[in-house]
Amino acid sequence: MPLKSLKNRLNQHFDLSPRYGSVKKIMPNIVYADGFNPSVGDVVKIEKSDGTECVGMVVVAEKEQFGFTPFNFIEGARAGDKVLFLKEGLNFPVGRNLLGRVLNPLGQVIDNKGALDYERLAPVITTPIAPLKRGLIDEVFSVGVKSIDGLLTCGKGQKLGIFAGSGVGKSTLMGMITRGCLAPIKVIALIGERGREIPEFIEKNLKGDLSSCVLVAATSDDSPLMRKYGAFCAMSVAEYFKNQGLDVLFIMDSVTRFAMAQREIGLALGEPPTSKGYPPSALSLLPQLMERAGKEENKGSITAFFSVLVEGDDLSDPIADQARSILDGHIVLSRELTDYGIYPPINILNSASRVAKDIISESQNLCARKFRRLYALLKENEMLIRIGSYQMGNDKELDEAIKKKALMEQFLAQDENALQPFEASFQQLEEILK
């Protein structure tokens, strides 16, 4: 059989197209090359003329060329460098041996504890749980924080956001939740954090105990692609444990820096900055990640807390607004409460858990509603009370709120090491309100 005919027949069953090409153009966050036809999401690498390599992911596929965003920085690369196809799609190691380890989004361990022994490689991008396969959120997920357990009760498989400006106490609260919950597995994604904050989070917020945790970290000096896919890699690890029938706590800090990474990539690709500098892809990326959390029938659950850095304490920020519309609840931290020395500084009047009323008893619901009503009365009349314009006896309910003010503030404040069971939080609520 002629060689040309043999090649044509083989091409019908196998992809025999070239798997290498060369760099044509280099831009700050995107490299263009030609020579073969990869698909969007494929992983390629540049062999630089100085002997080093740079791995990237294809984000643009055209007839004559393709563009990819690098995972690491491309200093030293030049036009004409060789580009090789590596694999179809990004995978990440999963398995029980990941517990206690710290990894980067490329699956490399960064904790100096030796080589990683993993079970298999799992795809980083997966389809969220089908709507009709989602289990109902009907069980309490206790986190050991009084103001959350008592007033913003979380459910197993719920997705919540922690919204706050910088320096208000998001990381401390997330550490309390991680240590206070009873989930056997905790997966933590630290995205866009300063390098020094990674060991600080482990030692200060987790008290050095990583035995039930897997931590995926992409620091602020990593490339936009590393920061973007760090969150997806961590979610793939959480899904592995969920599929084993386990209940998983997923913590991510922060969604804002995750969206900023996609903003850098989107703008490099020429997307219009439509919403306060964010291109459409940055906003559409949030549900792709967040909807992967939840409870699945005949499997386990992923209860997720996503921190959202609110620029200038503006809750109408596009990322905060988009996140709030996707999540099942929001916990708003208040700079004013921080100034008053109340920690965790949760603004219970601006916060909400959309499933709370369905997972706690009627008596617990009544307690939570009454506490919020009395606290709201205090806030509405705070100035009148301070300047002495309010006379006791004018409003029976406000009188009760004033008498219980110290006890209510004591309930909202909690030392980060004084975590307590769910039942104890409601017992304390009942004592205050009786």
Which residues does each PLM region occupy?
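A generic structural signal for well-ordered coil/turn residues at beta-strand boundaries
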Residues: 19, 27, 40, 98, ...
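Short, low-complexity, polar/charged sequence segments that are solvent-exposed and flexible
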Residues: 42-43, 51-52, 65, 77-78, ...
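P-loop NTPase nucleotide-binding/switch module
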Residues: 81-83, 110-158, 171-176, 209-222, ...
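Phosphate-interacting basic helix/loop segments used at nucleotide- and nucleic-acid interfaces
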Residues: 5-7, 86, 143-148, 234, ...
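Glycine/charge-rich, flexible interdomain linkers and switch-proximal surface loops
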Residues: 97-101, 149, 234
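P-loop NTPase catalytic core
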Residues: 150-151, 157-434
